[in-house]
């Protein structure tokens, strides 16, 4: 195993309190970059949880198609504005907040009376404008969850007096990664992984990365610690029986071949590793403009990245 290292290349706040971080993971073995990158991306976007407003009760309002006298926005517009409020909390229990404002006034998120432990990341976020002396009174339901929940999924009988919101719980908004090959003095290949994480500001990219890594560790720890595994029934895998099926759907772009080799393969309608494996070395070299040098490059890449040898 190489001496893997990780460092933060960039950490910055962008508009509306959102955050961006870029990380570099060095000294990975060939093939590990895409494995780690894909796994982290899935967990960052799908498994990390957060707190959000899931429902509201507005005084004098029974359905979302109503209007409030003296308030510029209708109820649908107010609900849409409330979806943009970003919250953070260390408490995962359902909690309630309250807002009561008399006009004329511009109503923003910082006017909400929050429950203990809940913090609003974008306090200047706009909610509504009251143009008369009327009162706008709203009760907020704060819930912890993960992913994206439609308003229809949030409804429970006890909430019949509440208006449900489409709720975005996930604190990570976007994840990108790219892999670069590094050659040492003896022409051995290692990989480095660049990982970019954008969050809504309720969690830092660094904390998000640590949390995602911990989720993955916990998952595989369960497999390691499973005492119900019957050691007597372990399968002994022999090299010749290893399946290459998991690699067949990998696009040839992931192999990061030279432009010449890549273009020749694409012109021959070879789009995936699975397509490539249908060719013997001799048949591969029969492709138009595909010389010995390109063939050697493909053979070497398949062996070093995926452990596959064409026969």
UniProtKB/Swiss-Prot annotation:
Its EC number is 2.7.7.6. InterPro entries: DNA-dir_RNA_pol_insert, DNA-dir_RNA_pol_RpoA/D/Rpb3, DNA-dir_RpoA, RBP11-like, RNAP_asu_C, RNApol_insert_sf. One of its GO terms (molecular function) is protein dimerization activity. Keywords: Chloroplast, DNA-directed RNA polymerase, Nucleotidyltransferase, Plastid, Transcription, Transferase. One of its GO terms (cellular component) is DNA-directed RNA polymerase complex. Residues 1-227 are annotated as: Alpha N-terminal domain (alpha-NTD). It is found in: Plastid, Chloroplast. The keyword Iron-sulfur does not apply. Pfam families: RNA_pol_A_bac (PF01000), RNA_pol_A_CTD (PF03118), RNA_pol_L (PF01193). Residues 242-311 are annotated as: Alpha C-terminal domain (alpha-CTD). It catalyses: RNA(n) + a ribonucleoside 5'-triphosphate = RNA(n+1) + diphosphate. GO terms for biological process: DNA-templated transcription. The N-terminal domain is essential for RNAP assembly and basal transcription, whereas the C-terminal domain is involved in interaction with transcriptional regulators and with upstream promoter elements. In plastids the minimal PEP RNA polymerase catalytic core is composed of four subunits: alpha, beta, beta', and beta''. When a (nuclear-encoded) sigma factor is associated with the core the holoenzyme is formed, which can initiate transcription. DNA-dependent RNA polymerase catalyzes the transcription of DNA into RNA using the four ribonucleoside triphosphates as substrates. Belongs to the RNA polymerase alpha chain family. This is DNA-directed RNA polymerase subunit alpha. The gene is rpoA.
């Amino acid at each position: 195993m190489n001496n893997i290292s990780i460092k933060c290349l960039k950490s910055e706040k962008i508009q509306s309190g959102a955050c961006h971080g870029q990380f570099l993971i060095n000294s990975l073995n060939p093939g590990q970059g895409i494995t780690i990158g894909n796994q982290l991306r899935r967990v960052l976007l799908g498994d990390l949880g957060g707190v959000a407003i899931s429902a509201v009760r507005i005084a004098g309002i029974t359905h979302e198609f109503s209007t409030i006298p003296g308030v510029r926005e209708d109820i649908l517009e107010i609900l849409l504005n409330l979806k943009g409020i970003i919250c953070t909390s260390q408490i995962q229990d359902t909690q309630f907040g309250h807002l009561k404002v008399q006009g004329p006034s511009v109503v923003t998120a910082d006017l909400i009376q929050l429950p203990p432990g809940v913090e609003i990341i974008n306090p200047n976020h706009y909610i509504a404008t009251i143009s008369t002396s009327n009162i706008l009174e709203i009760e907020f339901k704060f819930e912890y969850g993960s992913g994206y929940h439609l308003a229809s999924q949030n409804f429970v009988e006890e909430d019949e007096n509440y208006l449900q919101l489409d709720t975005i719980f996930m604190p990570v908004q976007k994840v990108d990664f790219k892999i670069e090959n590094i050659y040492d003095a003896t022409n051995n290949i290692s990989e480095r992984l660049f990982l970019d994480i954008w969050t809504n500001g309720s969690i830092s990219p660094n904390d998000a990365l640590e949390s995602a890594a911990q989720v993955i560790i916990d998952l595989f720890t369960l497999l390691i610690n499973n005492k119900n595994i019957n050691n007597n029934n372990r399968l002994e895998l022999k090299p010749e029986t290893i399946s290459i099926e998991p690699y067949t759907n990998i696009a040839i772009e992931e192999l990061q071949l030279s432009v010449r080799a890549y273009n020749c393969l694409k012109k021959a309608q070879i789009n995936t590793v699975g397509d490539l494996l249908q060719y013997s070395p001799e048949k591969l070299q029969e492709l138009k403009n595909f010389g010995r040098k390109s063939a050697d490059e493909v053979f070497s890449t398949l062996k070093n990245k995926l452990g596959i040898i064409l026969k």
